[in-house]
Structure formats: C-alpha cells, structure tokens
C-alpha cells in the first residue's frame, strides 16, 4: 500500500491556540467595557450572527476577533465553562 493511500493524522499542541483565544476574548471584553457596552451581550451577538459590527475597533478588538473562527471561540468558551463547573 502506497503512503498516499493511508490516512495521515495531524497532531499539534492546543496550548498556543487556547492562549490566543483567551487573550483575544479578554482584549475584546476590555475594549467593550471601555466603550461602555455590555461585553457579554455584544460578544454573544457577534457569536450568534457573525456580524463584526458588535465588536468595536477600539484596541483593535474587531480585527483580533475576526482572526479566529467563531466555532473556535465557542469551543473554548464551552471547554472553559465545563472545566470550571464539572463536579468531582
């Protein structure tokens, strides 16, 4: 069997991606607060709609959040929530 016929598995460390998502969310949250918006409502609006108008340009928040896929953001939020609220 040729090596082209085998399914390859790609492994990478999620640590840098997780840190990046956390940093972006914190930066966006802070930017929204500084501009007087309710950060949770605005982030939820962005995640549901994909419309970047929910995120201000302040502190480059809009550009930062658009570099990440919305499903990546949701995945990290769910993962973080479950890790913090999991019963032992």
From Swiss-Prot:
Q: Where is the signal peptide?
A: none
Q: Where on the tree of life does the source sit, at the highest rank?
A: Bacteria
Pfam families linked to this entry = IreB (PF06135)
Extract the InterPro entries matched here. Answer: IreB
The family line of this record is: Belongs to the UPF0297 family.
Q: Cite the PANTHER family for this sequence.
A: UPF0297 PROTEIN YRZL
Q: What is this protein called?
A: UPF0297 protein YrzL
Tell me the gene name. Answer: yrzL
């Amino acid at each position: 069997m040729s090596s082209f016929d085998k399914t390859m598995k790609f492994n990478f460390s999620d640590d840098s991606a997780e840190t990046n998502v956390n940093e972006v969310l914190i930066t966006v949250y802070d930017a929204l607060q500084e501009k007087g918006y309710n950060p949770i409502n605005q982030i939820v609006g962005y995640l549901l709609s994909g419309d970047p108008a929910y995120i201000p340009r302040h502190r480059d928040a809009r550009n930062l959040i658009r570099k990440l896929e919305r499903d990546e953001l949701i995945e990290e939020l769910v993962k973080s929530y479950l890790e913090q609220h999991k019963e032992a």
